[in-house]
Amino acid sequence: MIIQPIVEGQGDEAAVPLLLRRLRDEAQAWGLEVGRPHRKRRTQLVKKDSLQSAVRVAALRENCAAILVLFDADDDCPKELAPTLEEWALEAAGGKPCAVVMANREYEAWFLASIEALRGRASILPDATSHHEPEVPRDAKGQLERRMPRGASYSATVDQPILTAHLDLESAYRGCRSFRKLVSAFGELAVAAGVAPAVWPPSAWVS
């Protein structure tokens, strides 16, 4: 059984499968594999026709059991926009379970909630600290660069997969509502695909 991601950026192509496999392992949903992401521009993911086209392509991939659309909210409100996008996606999914998750405001906000675990990775300074409101800054990538040596820059294609591999999932869950939405959606998709997680989310994350 494969969960098929649809993403927006080059960094997401490498990072999102890593993240989903980490969630899969935490959930002990061993029968669930992660497909190669189908990438579309953000402008295409917020329009009905192009979103539905992407979902149809994903649904046709071999052994696709569920579809996850994941991209940055930017200045949009996930609570307002995501339900409409998910409705459109479900119309095109051919009966397959499908979820839309918008990282608020950017995927990198999840790193800002877990900086202590990322020290020494991708140039993150050894004394860097997490942001107290990681989903508030508009420029999460810039916030990451403030936690790097002067002159260092963040590269999504290089750094996003590295930081994803070392992200403290519990810290991201506790600090970011949109990450909690991702965790919830992942569990629901796994169940719908016939691969029920053990205890989800892990009890340690919610205690």
What are the functions of these language-model segments?
Residues P5-V7:
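Short hydrophobic beta-strand that contains or immediately precedes a catalytic carboxylate
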